[in-house]
């Protein structure tokens, strides 16, 4: 039988259409699936292989969503002295609800033998990892995807970098295969590493900045700033988080991201009640101590929100490639390519909405 006529399961079918797509389409696909890395070569194979490995994780999540009607998504951001996390629930209509959002310091309760801080001894790092998982609020009756990110800074000393690396590896290993209850045959925890470049590309890379920065009174030489500058990306991400919170708080649900806040959150965010538009700071809104805390909370919020949108995009791609049981068809390839281009355009239009707010922020 010709390979063209073979039926395929979902992930091999995704792989097939990625092979048939051109490199430009694969780069767009990487972005809309929040998997865009700064590739240093122009070959399809490494991009495709990485994409397919990411799709394999989302395929498990998609199957659970089909079977159970809801899944939990978590974003975790590890630093040397704390961790931040965000929890959202996605239903089978891809409406997304914010469930929990916290920053928790690594105090003595994360250490063993009455130590005041986490040591690098294996029992301590393992204990801290299990404590983190226990605080996330995973649901034994639902699938839970944990996206893990750690602080990356040249200013961190070696022991702090080592601790973050160890916790990241242990958390990934524990979430990748652990069962929340012994009665379930299938693991209820899934894990994915969330590199900062994924989040930056998904929320920032297509944002037009030049015209807005020229009108920003706090910037004397706007030409000095580029979209890849960390300060610009951090500013854009804060703007995006505020846009999403404001639209959800006002029940003006963004059609692309579909975030919802229940009444409980509206009581927790009094700052949003007393302000209009984006005239508030995340630091004050979330009752945080420092701007660094606000940055960490923004990272986990946007990582979790990106997972929700990625799951919906991936599910739509599955519907396309499985129209003929995974067989190759040139008409389906065109639909695949067109959908990727349209989703990239949708993301570009969403990012463009952040540009206007760059005129008034202090950079």
UniProtKB/Swiss-Prot annotation:
Keyword Mitochondrion: yes
Subcellular location: Mitochondrion
GO CC term (a single one): mitochondrion
GO biological process, alphabetically ordered: mitochondrial genome maintenance; mRNA processing
Keyword annotations from UniProtKB, A to Z: Mitochondrion, mRNA processing
GO molecular function: crossed form four-way junction DNA binding; DNA endonuclease activity; flap-structured DNA binding; Y-form DNA binding
Database matches in Gene3D superfamilies: Ribonuclease H-like superfamily/Ribonuclease H
Superkingdom, natural source: Eukaryota
Functional note: Function in mitochondrial RNA splicing in the excision of mitochondrial group I introns aI1 and aI5 beta from COX1 and bI3 from COB transcripts and thus would be involved in obtaining the correct structure of the intron, to allow the RNA catalyzed reactions to occur.
Name this protein carries in UniProt: Mitochondrial RNA-splicing protein MRS1
């Amino acid at each position: 039988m010709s390979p063209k006529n073979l039926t395929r399961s979902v992930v091999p079918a995704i792989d097939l259409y990625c092979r048939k797509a051109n490199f430009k389409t694969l780069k767009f696909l990487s972005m809309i699936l929040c998997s865009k890395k700064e590739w240093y070569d122009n070959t399809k194979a490494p991009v495709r292989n990485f994409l397919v490995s990411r799709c394999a994780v989302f395929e498990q999540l998609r199957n659970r969503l089909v079977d159970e009607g809801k899944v939990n998504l978590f974003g975790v951001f590890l630093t040397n002295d704390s961790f931040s996390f965000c929890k959202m629930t996605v239903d089978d209509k891809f409406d997304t609800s914010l469930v929990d959002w916290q920053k928790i310091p690594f105090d003595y309760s994360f250490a063993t033998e009455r130590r005041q801080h986490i040591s690098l001894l294996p029992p301590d790092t393992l204990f801290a990892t299990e404590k983190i998982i226990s605080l996330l609020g995973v649901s034994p009756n639902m699938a839970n995807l944990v996206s893990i990110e750690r602080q990356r800074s040249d200013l961190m000393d070696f022991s702090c970098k080592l601790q973050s690396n160890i916790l990241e590896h242990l958390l990934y290993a524990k979430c990748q295969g652990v069962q929340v209850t012994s009665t379930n045959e299938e693991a209820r925890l899934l894990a994915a590493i969330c590199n900062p470049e994924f989040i930056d590309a998904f929320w920032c890379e297509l944002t037009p900045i030049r015209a807005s920065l020229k009108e920003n009174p706090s910037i004397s030489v706007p030409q000095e700033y580029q979209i890849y500058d960390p300060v610009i990306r951090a500013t854009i991400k804060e703007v995006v988080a505020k846009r999403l919170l404001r639209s959800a708080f006002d029940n003006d649900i963004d059609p692309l991201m579909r975030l919802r806040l229940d009444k409980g959150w509206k009581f927790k965010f009094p700052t949003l009640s007393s302000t209009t538009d984006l005239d508030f700071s995340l630091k004050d809104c979330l009752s945080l101590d420092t701007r660094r805390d606000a940055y960490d909370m923004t990272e986990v919020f946007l990582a979790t929100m990106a997972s929700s949108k990625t799951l919906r995009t991936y599910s739509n791609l599955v519907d396309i490639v499985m129209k003929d049981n995974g067989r190759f068809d040139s008409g389906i390839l065109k639909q695949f390519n067109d959908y990727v281009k349209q989703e990239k355009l949708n993301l570009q239009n969403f990012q463009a909405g952040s540009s206007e707010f760059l005129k008034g922020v202090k950079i």
